[in-house]
Structures are given as structure tokens and as C-alpha cells.
Amino acid sequence: LLQVPLEKGQSAREYLQEQGLWEQYRLKYPYNPMAKFDPSFAVAGEPMTNDADLAYYG
């Protein structure tokens, strides 16, 4: 078992907001996590995480 330390960084949303590009990005790439999967494989009713808000890496 290996322990990997986590580091907190800026989320993609924070970075784009800082650059003033978040609204432009959000309009160009609307949040739709199921767009990349075949709908016949849908088995869950829970939405997937929004990767734009991830801030911990390790």
C-alpha cells in the first residue's frame, strides 16, 4: 500500500473564471456527461460529477 499526498490546486472552473473565460467555455461546452456514452448502457439515475469543480490531485 502506497500513500500518495494530495495537493489542492485550482479547479478548471476557478482558473477559467480568473481568466474571464468561464461563461464562454460554459456556453461552448454545455455540461452533459452522458453525451460521450451510448444511452443503452444507462443504468443509474444519479448524475455524474462535474469535473470542472475538482480541485484535489494526487
UniProtKB/Swiss-Prot annotation:
Residues of the propeptide region, as annotated, are 1-41
Instruction: Return the Pfam families for the record.
Output: A1_Propeptide
> What InterPro entries does the record point to?
Aspartic_peptidase_N (IPR012848)
Q: Name one GO biological process term.
A: proteolysis
Q: Which UniProt keywords apply?
A: Aspartyl protease, Hydrolase, Protease, Zymogen
One GO term in the molecular function aspect is: aspartic-type endopeptidase activity
Entry superkingdom? Eukaryota
Give the family from UniProt.
Belongs to the peptidase A1 family.
What is the name of this protein? Pepsin-1
Look up and give the organism this protein is from: Thunnus orientalis
